[in-house]
Amino acid sequence: MSNIVSYLFETKAIKFCEENKPFFLTSGMISPYFVNTHFLYGNEKEATEFLSYINTLLEDRVNLPKKVFDKVLVQYKNNAIFKYTIDTMIKAITDNVDVNEIDYISGGERRDWYFSNMIAYLLKKPHLTLFKDMEAFVSPYDFFSTEKITDIEGKTVLNASDLVTAASNYVRSWIPAVKNLNGKLLWTCYVVDRKQGGTEVLEKEGIKTIPLALVDNTLFEKAFELGIINQGQLEMLKGFYHDPYTAMREFLINHPEFIENALKSTDERTQKRVKLLVDGNLYNLT
């Protein structure tokens, strides 16, 4: 088991649901596990506080990159888990790409910035801070200054990211953003591949993918061996890995009380998400 996987377990960056209690996702779909890769910043508390800090900076785009960099640099020097994660990303990049061919490192709003700023610094490459509205800002590797940029004149880009699921952020924002800059997004290094089609989407776009850890049956079996999950949880996870939609649809058919209880929940987020599931008939239950 790689240290990245052990740290994913240790920091609870991968969180498994209790038996027969899958998590609601933002979309209204359900899943037996949830991934918060940014917890590799050190732990859940520090990662969550840093995300809140980033949120306070979103309206100040010119100063945001330097302020984010200052935080991650201190964390890199002081937190062994975060340092190991960044160093492992650097090794994966240098093992798979001729670094001399990379002109820019990019990172997209918001969780990519936990990783991309340090990658740029250590590789001594200028950094592109990308926003979901496709606006871009460029900084030198030491983030001494930042300015808006609209054209990188055919230069090459490697995006450093936390997680790939279906690659929706890439398709919707990061790939178009780099194209709008007249750049070429040729590589992406990310910590976790959820193995739900995103890597294939990126490869079809001509992007070389460099994941550190895969969420697959091998990882689930390791969690079982370590006593993190039980046999029932393992079977649900394996079913989900094989066919997420069918596995969760069958679960809902066999456990009608799950939706009934969610509809009675006093938690606003649960209420919102279960209504998306029911109103959208996301699992074709009616």
Predicted segments — roles?
Residues 1-161, 165-286:
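PRPP-associated nucleotide enzymes
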